[in-house]
Amino acid sequence: GEEVGLTLQKRFRYIREAFSNDELTQIYKLDETKLPRYPLGWEPWLQTALDTIQYQTETEELIFYVGEKAYKEELEARGFEVHLEERRFGISATMIRENPSKYWKYIAQPFRRQFTKKVLIMGSASNGKTTLAKDLARFYDAPVSLEYAREYQIKNNVRDDELTPKDYYYLLLGQYDQTSKLIDSSANRGLVIADTNSLVTKGYYDYYMEVEGQDTSMTDTFDNLFVSILSKEKWDLILFVQPIGSYVNDGFRDMTMADEEIRTSFSNYLDQLR
């Protein structure tokens, strides 16, 4: 798991999540960092495992269920009852890691977020990003996370140039939450496309809040939130769309952005941020 970014802590949390509704199953974490690598170290590994589950030899019965014959032999040699559970689907963890999309239906739901390919389409407004995102999503039969800011502005009836620092906090959190939920949804079959991300929100914040001369404490709060969210966003591919075509007035856009010089300058700033 480590080779694909699945640390011990992630694996532990994801498995706990998978069994969250199972009251009869308990999940433990066994750190093998200081133990000899397999096939060595059976004795210290076994003792660590027994200590971890707080096994009481005099009052409890312990049965191991394993997927490898070698494991069964080693544990039986040490006096434990062992059941060998052979693979029923002809797949392995290695096969999934090498080609997750092929074996997508066999990947437990919490682990799918780790193997999802995430494509970001970013750029300034009114340049065809949304159309491109929808077309790609339709072609690849993938879910798409559209611009949360537009939904937010329609709901609150607020234009680009009327947004406050507090609004931008909500935009950062809302966009990240929307995309994260899509990645974790049943609609995700291994590919998710996003129309925008925190970098674009940061670009607009810098553009409008600098003009309005907001105090530094608000900017510091926003920047801390931005850095935190940006560190969690992992993209496999970023498509940067240049500002080509007419700037459409949809009732919420700031039409000063229709000026070619301003539009190009803002697009260049976004390019620098990424």
Language model: regions and residue ranges:
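Conserved substrate/cofactor phosphate-moiety recognition/catalytic segment
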Residues: 138-180
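Hydrophobic anchor at the beta1->P-loop junction of P-loop NTPases
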Residues: 121
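P-loop (Walker A) phosphate-binding loop of NTP-binding proteins
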Residues: 124
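Nucleotidyltransferase catalytic core that binds NTPs
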Residues: 1-117
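Glycine-rich phosphate-binding loop used to anchor ATP phosphates in small-molecule kinases
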Residues: 169-233
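Conserved glycine(s) of the Walker
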Residues: 128
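A glycine- and Lys/Arg-enriched "phosphate-lid" helix/loop adjacent to the NTP-binding pocket
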Residues: 208-273
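Hydrophobic positions on the alpha1 helix immediately C-terminal to the Walker A/P-loop
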Residues: 132, 136
